[in-house]
A protein has these predicted regions:
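Donor nucleotide-sugar binding/catalytic pocket of nucleotide-sugar-dependent glycosyltransferases
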Residues: 52-90
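An aromatic- and histidine-rich active-site surface loop
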Residues: 1-14, 113-115, 244
């Protein structure tokens, strides 16, 4: 990192165009697992120096591009995109008597998911009609322990019961109140196995999948949730959750924040459905509207299908990898004319 800006200047001096590509803000908030690591090594400062030195910077949204332009005016936007012919985006959704609500993500989203804590409890009267999915469950990782006498730091693999995914699971199961004791006993074994009868449970744990097949998990549910806290790191994120849900024709309930404001239009006006393509939750309404929006869709299941179709129409051409790659290729060609 330290020598990168100097190297970039040397390359530019030789007539070589240097392009930096970035899709995450350089300084995550304090609750993020890697915040301390970045601060200790001043990685955020080094990233900004590289962005300043680059001939061009590529990123995924105009929101993030405007932030980068504070350091480098030559910023171009190429959004995240999907190959619609890739098998992981063609998995069929099987029918169910229940309306399935799902979340799919990684291990750094505890504070985002806290926005919906209490939602499952509020939906208790509708529980016989609902089933929840958490996709990406993982017990891998390490924990750093510090010897109080010597200050020595040692790393060890986390124990299964230490995984942050258990905290996710407690949010989606109302602290395991909505599942049977027998199923809870199975979950506590932390075995990546099918549970016979899981289709009858109110919650399903879905283990992590490789990057080339994780999106198949969208086929498991009908309504996709995308809660994010309103802070600079999240505002600079891409709208990938919108794109993925759209290609799978899922009804989406999302935070009315940053990347989700790019393509989404709220589909409710004074309790009546309008021409929007998703349901958005304002910051001031996090305490109530996640449950209200799910309830609205449970009571109007035809809107689950309609919103999924509308979102698909929004994303299917704009975020088709073939089109985005063509545009990117044209940009590269323009640099060497």
């Amino acid at each position: 990192y330290d020598s990168c800006p100097e190297l970039i200047e040397k390359l530019k001096g030789m007539g070589i165009i240097v392009i930096a590509d970035i899709d995450d803000y350089w300084l995550p908030t304090k609750e993020h697992p890697i915040h301390q690591l970045i601060m200790q090594n001043k990685l955020h400062e080094k990233i900004v120096k590289n962005l300043k030195a680059a001939s061009y910077v590529m990123t995924t949204t105009e929101i993030f591009a405007n932030e980068i332009r504070k350091f480098n005016k030559n910023v171009v936007v190429f959004p995240n995109a999907i190959d619609p012919n890739e098998s992981q985006f063609k998995e069929p959704t099987l029918p169910s008597d229940k309306i399935r609500v799902g979340w799919l993500g990684g291990s750094s989203h505890l504070h985002d998911l806290k926005l919906i804590d209490g939602t499952i409890s509020k939906l208790s009267p509708l529980q016989d009609k609902l089933q929840y999915y958490v996709c990406g469950f993982d017990t891998r990782g390490t924990v750093t322990e510090i010897n109080k006498q010597t200050g020595e730091k040692t790393q060890r693999p986390i124990k299964p019961e230490e995984t942050v995914w258990l905290k996710y699971e407690k949010i989606f199961t109302n602290d395991y109140k909505i599942i049977t004791p027998k199923y809870k006993e199975f979950l506590e074994k932390f075995e990546d196995k099918e549970y016979f009868g899981s289709e009858n449970e109110n919650y399903v744990r879905v283990w992590t999948k490789p990057v080339n097949s994780y999106a198949k998990n969208y086929s498991k549910f009908d309504i996709s949730l995308a809660p994010i806290q309103d802070h600079v790191f999240n505002r600079m994120k891409s709208q990938l959750k919108v794109i993925e849900a759209g290609f799978y024709k899922k009804a989406l309930i999302a935070s009315n924040v940053g990347p989700y404001t790019i393509d989404l239009k709220h589909a409710l006006n004074q309790g009546q459905f309008t021409d929007g393509n998703a349901l958005l939750v304002d910051n001031a309404r996090n305490h109530s509207d996640w449950a209200k929006n799910i309830k609205k869709l449970v009571e109007n299941p035809n809107m689950i299908v309609d919103l999924g179709e509308r979102l698909y129409e929004t994303v299917k051409d704009k975020y088709d990898l073939n089109q985005v790659t063509k545009t990117r290729s044209e940009f590269y060609k323009s640099l060497i004319k």
